[in-house]
Regions:
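Short, hydrophobic secondary-structure boundary micro-motifs
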Residues: 15, 160, 185-186
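Acidic/histidine-enriched alpha-helical segments
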Residues: 163-167
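Terminal, non-catalytic domain-edge segments
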Residues: 146, 150, 154, 168-172, ...
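Surface-exposed patches in mature extracellular/periplasmic domains of secreted proteins
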Residues: 155-162
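Aromatic-lined, polymer-binding surfaces characteristic
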Residues: 1-155
Length: 239
């Protein structure tokens, strides 16, 4: 099994990583932890102690890099959302509540960035991305929905209170994906959003089918490499 050899080698745990290396590390941790969650939920597989140590070190590295960025809200963007989710996912696999608390703090910082604009809502850092603004909104909301869902299943009511703003953002992103012209529009012609950037949608639609039902077809088409593939079957039971 590849994960065993990666753990033995301590893959991606080096201290001195470039900015791009740090980005890759958090995305890798997200996909890795989510695949571990799927394996634990759907098979008899269990994480070994060596793999736990490796996962713990990866999460530590992500937190060390991401924590200072929370003091710079002018920089805080989708990268930070993904860092928070990656650490939360690792915390769920490791059963380490402190990591969930750290991730929750990052979640609320992100929720605070949701801003009304022209009949819809935007994330200002992502709205500044020119022709890819809509695409980046789809990418950015994915870790937020995953944190809200995982948090809800673990005693953190992240869809409630200010978290209700996530519903407006989800609706706006679906409008972007559908190219229906509703809500916010940008001056520059936008790149179409590929289905794999909508990996969050099956999770959200399962909990809130009356809000944003999935279009007819195979929900697996919304799988993403950043989430370890499709999430359509991971959280089917609503607590």
């Amino acid at each position: 099994m590849a994960v065993a050899s990666w753990a033995q080698a301590g893959a991606l745990t080096q201290k001195d990583a470039s900015k791009q290396g740090e980005a890759v590390r958090k995305w890798f941790l997200s996909a890795l932890a989510m695949n571990m969650m799927k394996a634990q939920a759907l098979t008899a597989w269990q994480v070994s102690e060596e793999q736990r140590d490796w996962l713990r070190l990866l999460a530590d590295r992500v937190q060390i890099y991401a924590t200072p960025r929370r003091q710079r809200m002018d920089l805080y963007n989708n990268h930070d959302y993904w860092s928070s989710w990656a650490v939360m996912a690792a915390g769920l696999v490791l059963d380490e509540p402190a990591r969930l608390s750290w991730a929750e703090q990052g979640y609320w910082l992100a929720i605070g960035q949701i801003t009304p604009r022209n009949g819809g809502v935007v994330l200002p850092r992502e709205a500044a991305r020119g022709k890819r603004a809509e695409e980046y909104h789809a990418f950015a909301i994915t870790p937020l929905i995953l944190m809200a869902e995982a948090g809800t299943r673990n005693g953190l009511p992240l869809y409630e209170g200010d978290g209700q703003q996530l519903h407006a953002l989800a609706a706006q992103v679906v409008h972007f994906w559908a190219q229906d012209g509703k809500g916010v529009s940008f001056a520059q012609r936008q790149v179409a959003i590929d289905d794999h950037k909508m990996a969050w949608w099956p999770v959200y639609a399962h909990r809130f089918p009356e809000r944003l039902p999935l279009p007819a077809g195979d929900a697996d088409r919304f799988g993403s490499r950043f989430t370890g593939g499709s999430l359509a079957g991971l959280w089917q039971a609503t607590p």
